[in-house]
Amino acid sequence: MVDKRESYTKEDLLASGRGELFGAKGPQLPAPNMLMMDRVVKMTETGGNFDKGYVEAELDINPDLWFFGCHFIGDPVMPGCLGLDAMWQLVGFYLGWLGGEGKGRALGVGEVKFTGQVLPTARKVTYRIHFKRIVNRRLIMGLADGEVLVDGRLIYTAHDLKVGLFQDTSAF
């Protein structure tokens, strides 16, 4: 049985990483340090820009986050690839929320644009995922557009984020 709520706490997300939230066959989020969100504040099967589902999540920023110490020394900035990975994480999480089973794998993105950055002085990153299509056949796949905001300002956009759930990843 899927634990299908409209919001999830940090502990819930950590439980997902241990395989406890969506069952033994459901997709898992990564564990810290690669878990790129502190909470999911909204999940719906409708809504978003295409009325096919919406997820909103947040990451609290503080200067002690691991990536600021190494990217870059003297010029700390959150790597843009981590924001992109967070969006893929949320697409996979949504597929598990819908009841999908399998191991989540990012399959690509059509276009990504960076128009800003996350600095250690920021307070909060918000991720918004707008689902365009869910494929539920032999392969379960989500297709979505995403946005990353820092302190309410749009800084990244991603079009055609793709994540699939696989029963067997040995040939992937």
Curated annotation (Swiss-Prot):
GO MF term set: (3R)-hydroxyacyl-[acyl-carrier-protein] dehydratase activity; trans-2-decenoyl-acyl-carrier-protein isomerase activity
GO biological process, one term: unsaturated fatty acid biosynthetic process
Subunit architecture: Homodimer.
Pathway(s) where this gene product acts: Lipid metabolism; fatty acid biosynthesis
InterPro entries: FabA (IPR010083), FabA_FabZ (IPR013114), HotDog_dom_sf (IPR029069)
Family, similarity comment: Belongs to the thioester dehydratase family. FabA subfamily.
Reactions listed under catalytic activity: a (3R)-hydroxyacyl-[ACP] = a (2E)-enoyl-[ACP] + H2O; (3R)-hydroxydecanoyl-[ACP] = (2E)-decenoyl-[ACP] + H2O; (2E)-decenoyl-[ACP] = (3Z)-decenoyl-[ACP]
UniProt protein name: 3-hydroxydecanoyl-[acyl-carrier-protein] dehydratase
Subcellular compartments: Cytoplasm
Functional note: Necessary for the introduction of cis unsaturation into fatty acids. Catalyzes the dehydration of (3R)-3-hydroxydecanoyl-ACP to E-(2)-decenoyl-ACP and then its isomerization to Z-(3)-decenoyl-ACP. Can catalyze the dehydratase reaction for beta-hydroxyacyl-ACPs with saturated chain lengths up to 16:0, being most active on intermediate chain length.
Cellular component aspect of the GO annotation: cytoplasm
CDD domains (alphabetical): FabA
Enzyme Commission designation: 4.2.1.59, 5.3.3.14
Native source species: Salmonella typhimurium (strain LT2 / SGSC1412 / ATCC 700720)
Catalytic-site annotation from UniProt: H71
